[in-house]
Curated annotation (Swiss-Prot):
Belongs to the bacterial ribosomal protein bL35 family. The lineage of its organism: Bacteria, Pseudomonadati, Pseudomonadota, Gammaproteobacteria, Enterobacterales. This is Large ribosomal subunit protein bL35. It comes from the Bacteria. Keywords: Ribonucleoprotein, Ribosomal protein. One of its GO terms (cellular component) is cytosolic large ribosomal subunit. GO terms for molecular function: structural constituent of ribosome. Gene3D superfamilies: 4.10.410.60.
C-alpha cells in the first residue's frame, strides 16, 4: 500500500494544536491595507482555529499531521 501524499499547500497553511485542532492565519492582511481600519487589521493579526465544519477537509489534506 503506497503512502498517502500530503497536500503541500495545506501543510504550509495549517499547524496542528495539542488539542487536535488546527491553527490558521486570517485572510485580508496582505495588501491594500490603507483603507482598512487599525481595529480591523489588529483583529486579523492573531491566529484562529479551523472551524468544525472545515476540520474534515484539513485532516484529509494532512494525513500525517
Amino acid at each position: 500500500m503506497p503512502k498517502i501524499k500530503t497536500v503541500r499547500g495545506a501543510a504550509k497553511r495549517f499547524k496542528k494544536t495539542a488539542g487536535g485542532g488546527f491553527k490558521r492565519k486570517h485572510a485580508n492582511l496582505r495588501h491594500i491595507l490603507t483603507k482598512k481600519s487599525t481595529k480591523r487589521k489588529r483583529h486579523l493579526r492573531p491566529k484562529s482555529q479551523v472551524s468544525k465544519g472545515d476540520l474534515g477537509l484539513v485532516v484529509a489534506c494532512l494525513p500525517y499531521a
